[in-house]
Regions:
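Amphipathic alpha-helical hairpins
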Residues: 1-134
Length: 134
């Protein structure tokens, strides 16, 4: 069981959404942010750096959006769907864009393939959480 799920299960108040879906999204957001940061580092070490500029930019944007969304979704007190919903929507959009870009490099760079997978998983987890919001 992930730490996100353990924290939700031990939360003294009411969690307003399905804890399993929320925990999966929190875990995916964390993994995606980390994968994007690591991919940027790997991209900067590639010989063809000029070809990686768009990938680097999207990975940085994706990591930032995922990190912000991770923080908001991890807090349950005074939950406000009007704040959470647009962040999740932004996360879906940037994860799709970043995943698409990393996918273009996946055949040449294994780190891009891994990042693409993290982006796709996060995009799906955010979609699933969005579907449960009231």
């Amino acid at each position: 069981m992930s730490y996100a799920r353990q924290m939700l299960d031990t939360y003294p108040g009411t969690v307003g959404v399905d804890a399993a879906v929320l925990a999966a999204a929190i875990d995916a957001l964390s993994d995606c942010a980390q994968a994007c940061i690591a991919d940027v580092d790997a991209d900067l070490s590639e010989q063809n750096l000029a070809e990686m500029v768009t990938c680097i930019r999207l990975c940085l944007d994706c990591a930032d959006v995922c990190t912000a969304t991770l923080g908001v979704t991890s807090r349950q007190a005074s939950y406000d769907a009007s704040v959470t919903r647009p962040l999740l929507q932004a996360c879906v959009a940037i994860c799709k864009s970043c995943g698409d870009e990393c996918g273009r490099h996946a055949q040449m760079h294994e780190h891009c393939r891994v990042c693409e997978q993290a982006c796709r998983r996060c995009e799906q987890a955010c979609r699933e959480l969005l579907a449960t919001l009231k």
